[in-house]
Amino acid sequence: MRNYRTFDEFKADYFYEHPEEIDEFITIIFEEYAKDGDIKALLASLRTVSRVKGITAIAEETGLSRNGIQKALSENGNPYFESINAILHAIGFRLMPQRI
């Protein structure tokens, strides 16, 4: 039986090899979320970036537990606004309103 990587693993590997692409990826995922409101896709993308940046490092910087971050960004996650904001700050971003 062959072992295959999941798409999430493939994305994470890509960003490990191309960290310079993360900024544009974050911009795109929030643009897409603004258009379609697909929270699961947004959380999955943030989960990928968080894995690349390091869940432990993010936990230390945010004061959230590793488990709390993983739960917030899980497929069934329903994170608090403060959690998403803290995670974004830890990976070098901020939420900023923009007129539609």
Q: What residue spans do the PLM features occupy?
A:
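N-terminal flexible/basic segments that precede or flank functional cores
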Residues: M1-A44
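DNA major-groove recognition helix of helix-turn-helix/homeodomain DNA-binding modules
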Residues: Y80-Q98
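Residue-level detection of the helix-turn-helix DNA-binding "recognition helix"
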Residues: S74-E75
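Short, charged recognition helix plus adjacent turn
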Residues: V52, P97-I100
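Short alpha-helical DNA-recognition segment
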Residues: T48-K71
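Proline- and acidic/polar-enriched loop/turn elements at helix boundaries
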Residues: T62, K71, N85, R99-I100
